[in-house]
Structure formats: structure tokens, C-alpha cells
Amino acid sequence: MPKYRSATTTHGRNMAGARALWRATGMTDDDFGKPIIAVVNSFTQFVPGHVHLRDLGKLVAEQIEASGGVAKEFNTIAVDDGIAMGHGGMLYSLPSRELIADSVEYMVNAHCADAMVCISNCDKITPGMLMASLRLNIPVIFVSGGPMEAGKTKLSDQIIKLDLVDAMIQGADPKVSDAQSDQVERSACPTCGSCSGMFTANSMNCLTEALGLSQPGNGSLLATHADREQLFLSAGTRIVELTKRYYEQDDASALPRNIANKAAFENAMTLDIAMGGSTNTVLHLLAAAQEAEIDFTMSDIDKLSRKVPQLCKVAPSTPKYHMEDVHRAGGVLGILGELDRAGLLNREVKNILGLTLPQSLEQYDIMLTKDDAVKSMFRAGPAGIRTTKAFSQNCRWDTLDDDRAEGCIRSLEHAYSQEGGLAVLYGNFAENGCIVKTAGVDDSILKFTGPAKVYESQDDAVEAILGGKVVAGDVVVIRYEGPKGGPGMQEMLYPTTFLKSMGLGKACALITDGRFSGGTSGLSIGHVSPEAASGGNIAIIEDGDLIEIDIPNRGIQLQLSDQEIAARREAQDARGDKAWTPKDRQREVSYALRAYATLATSADKGAVRDKSKLGG
């Protein structure tokens, strides 16, 4: 029988000092022997996805204590990628994932907590907490802050839906008036919550639900809706049940590695491909799999991408649907239901409720359920009122979107595309692969060949795009922006956005060893591996080189002979200590970022630390 980890600090005469300190936090004799459950919050006033979380940790803690546990809350950091975008702040975004994972490990292991409730929401916070959960392998439940309501405004006598990316595009488009740009800016992000499209934050919260580590509805139920409070209340109750199942009943099925096993990872990636999720999810799932010691690689993702159709299309891939619409159509379990009926899922997986996939679908798939309360929950909709408060409204759609022919979520027979929303490409400068969000690529440019315009930094590329130096037919190459080369693997949302602003969204390609925001669409290919700073052939591309992109056949090729590639690599090596580094780039890199770069691996490994350098 497993022993409560917390007993290390609460039992025995030699722990009198530790108990004295616990007493100073409010614990009493009756509490010693109860499970100590960490409430891992990520409240911050910097991030709209987290601005409403201050009181939610207390809400969970009260339920834990009412259910027989002891709750102890702490906070992690949280970076807002949108605010950090387009300047040196973006260098810190991906490295913050590792800091979050480490800080959770430090706090939980230092104080011998028995289990966790992770209150996450945005881009690097959910992945960081997920990595820590699988690293620690103690009972855990995720409950996120929830999606933002879509922005809405009236343009040309028509009400349209908006999000952050629309504000960025309008702000950079010289044809848009100051008044219209200001109107869109003020309307784009109306409430607390993670940005309203299928961007990285919402993608990861959906995948955490698919992995089985959060409750039904968690990935799609709006932050502002009163129904979301129940997810927090039940998380507090259920984590105590889960904890006791493991420690008191010796039931290892309660542990995250046994819930989020390889079959669950395959299901999560299948969901991601079907819903056209952010390319960043590939990075984070690969990293989480390594923490779980699961053999899940780019090769697995490639195989899935070739057989999974696209069943859901959401902003930024279409302006028609946002997360509030996904929820109305049944949320994560609505998509999983269609995938299950198509025979594309592993059915033996279980979630934190102890339900198998078929049992979950029977109860929570709107196409199957007989439960009126479940149907009511999925009718939870937006109020259209600006607010930073959680659970502040109780509006509902009159009907569910169960139209699987033309609705937000489609059946296999009516798929948006028989090709999924993500694809892995391979070629002579992406030997270990690269990623493209095919859901956001226009059919006219699925095959594309053009001359390279090469830039050693995102900043130089942005200047060239806005300065008219990039023209239709070009392939923009931005390198030395990978995990090691950046360092920090910046998101390239500004270059892709500005290509659209300049009318080049369907006329150019962009390739990088960096990554993209979940808000990116267009022919944007990232995660090129190996990255330039690790000796990847992306470093030897020169202006004017022809690059061929063939998404249907999963290929990407620099049109050079093997002999010319070898000669250029020799020339690069001949630069000595300057080899595989950017030329003439002026960038201040702090010691914290240098430490990150020293251990960083390329994107095909999830940009995790190179354990071989640590003796691991």
C-alpha cells in the first residue's frame, strides 16, 4: 500500500519542527494524516486568461477541505504571449514552460504534497503544469480558466466575430482607417479567458481533456459562464477521491501516467489533427510524453496526420467559429464522438472520473446523451458583456449545434477535409521534420515553389515585409530562431500577420526553425529540425535558392544537389567558433536565456532539455 508522501513531514517525533510550521499555516491535530493537496494556481493580472483566477484557488481549496483533505495553494508564473509578441519579451515565453514545470516540482516535492489540482489556462502554463504532473506522477486534476468570449463589432453594416489576430491584422494594414483599427482593437478581446479561437491555450486545454486529466467540458466552456464554477467545485471533491483511491486503496489507475498513457496521447493528437489545433501543441505533447517516459515521437504524429480527417474548423482558420461555437456543438467530446464513430480512437483509455472512452461518450457526447443537464451545459453561451469576472453570466443558446453536415463539428462523411488540420513535412533541410497547420492553408497553395528570402531574425523579416521587399511568390526563411538559436523559439505571429496585411497571405510561404502562435494561418511552416543553431541545413539556405513545398506528399525540399549542400556545410564549419550562428545579428541575451539555450534540444524533441548533458 502506498504511503502518503505528506507523512514524511507530519508523522514522528523528529518532525516536530515541520509540524510546528504546518500549525502556523492553520493546520491542527485533526489535519495530520489527511492528504495534503497542492492547489497550483496561476493567477496574474498580466494575462486575461488568468486575471480571473485569484479567487478560484480558494474555491477549490474549500472543496478539498470539505471532502477530507488539506489544501495548500501556491502560484506559478504566467507569460502572455500576445503581450510579449513582437519584441524581446517573446524570447522568454517557451523557456517559461520549463520554469513552470520545475517550480511545480520544487514546491510539491519540497513539501511532500500528495496530489495536485492544476489551475491553468494559457499557452505555456498548461503545458508546464502537464509536464510537471507527468514527471511527479501523483494524482492530479486540471481545471482551466476557460476560453474568452469572441469579440463582436459592426463593420459595413454587418456584425462580425473578432479575436486578437484580427486586431493585429487591422492595425498593420495601411488600407484600414485609424477609426476602424481602433474599433476592432476595442472589440477583439471583450472578457477574461484564453483568446477565443483555436489558438495554443484552448488547443492545450482541449488536449488535456482528451488525455483524460480534466473533466468533460473543461476545454470549451466559457470563462464567464456560471456553469464553469461546477468544474472547480467538483475538481476539489474529485481530487480527494482520486488521492484516496491511490494511497488508501492501492489503485495505481488513479495516477496520471496510467491515465495519460500512450493510447491517450495518440487520442489527444488525433483530436488535435481533427480540430486543426495550434502547431505548438505538437511541441508540448512531445515534451509531455518525454516526462511520462512514453515513446511518442514525430513519426507517430506523421502517421496519424495521414489518416485523420479535419472535422472542426475554428478561428484563425475561419472567422465563422470560435470556442463558444465549439462548445455549443459538443466540445471535445463532440469531436471525439465523431472520431470514435470513424474508428480512429483507442477506446480502452480512461479519464480521471474512471470512465472509459465509450462510457464518457455515452454520457457526454451530445449526439448520444439522454442527460438534459449535459445538454444544458453545452448550451452555455456568451453574454457579450465586457468583464474580467469568472462565472458572471448564465446565457444559453436556444439550441445545440448538432448539425454534423454543415455545423461547427462535422462527421467523417461531411469532413472539412479528409486530410487533417496538421501535417509533418520532411526534406533535405528538415531531416527530422517540420510542422504546418494545414487547416489554415488555402487549397491553392498546398503545393508551392519559390525563391528564398533569408533573414537571420524575426525583426529583419518584419522590416522587409512591411518595407515591400517581400513580393508574391517568395518563400520567407527566418532562421536562428529555434530553442537554442533564439534562444527561446519565438512565435512568428507578426511576420505571418503582416504578410496578410500586405496582401500576401495566399501568395507567399514562411519557413522557420522558430514556431508560430496558435493564431497563425497561411502557408506557415515551423519547427524545422534540426534548427540552424544545431547544424541544420536551414542555416545554409541563401537568397534566391528555390524551395519546393508539397503538403499533399508531405515534402519540403531545397533544390540543391547533395554536392552543393555538402560544400555549403563545409563553408559553414570553416567559420570556426562562428559556425552555425547568425551573421551580424544584434541581440542581447540574458544569462537566464543562455542557460536555457545550453540545454535546449530542437523542436522535434519537444524543445526539452538535453538530459545527456545532465548525466541523465
Curated annotation (Swiss-Prot):
The modification N6-carboxylysine is found at residue 124. Keywords: 2Fe-2S, Amino-acid biosynthesis, Branched-chain amino acid biosynthesis, Iron, Iron-sulfur, Lyase, Magnesium, Metal-binding. It catalyses: (2R)-2,3-dihydroxy-3-methylbutanoate = 3-methyl-2-oxobutanoate + H2O; (2R,3R)-2,3-dihydroxy-3-methylpentanoate = (S)-3-methyl-2-oxopentanoate + H2O. Mg(2+) binds at residues 81, 123-124, 491. Its EC number is 4.2.1.9. GO terms for cellular component: cytosol. Pfam families: ILV_EDD_C, ILVD_EDD_N. Gene3D superfamilies: IlvD/EDD C-terminal domain-like. GO terms for molecular function: 2 iron, 2 sulfur cluster binding; dihydroxy-acid dehydratase activity; magnesium ion binding. It comes from the Bacteria. The active site is at 517 (proton acceptor). Binds 1 [2Fe-2S] cluster per subunit. This cluster acts as a Lewis acid cofactor. [2Fe-2S] cluster binds at residues 122, 195. Its cofactor is [2Fe-2S] cluster; Mg(2+). GO terms for biological process: isoleucine biosynthetic process; L-valine biosynthetic process. The keyword S-adenosyl-L-methionine does not apply. Belongs to the IlvD/Edd family. Functions in the biosynthesis of branched-chain amino acids. Catalyzes the dehydration of (2R,3R)-2,3-dihydroxy-3-methylpentanoate (2,3-dihydroxy-3-methylvalerate) into 2-oxo-3-methylpentanoate (2-oxo-3-methylvalerate) and of (2R)-2,3-dihydroxy-3-methylbutanoate (2,3-dihydroxyisovalerate) into 2-oxo-3-methylbutanoate (2-oxoisovalerate), the penultimate precursor to L-isoleucine and L-valine, respectively. Homodimer. This is Dihydroxy-acid dehydratase. It comes from Enterobacter sp. (strain 638).
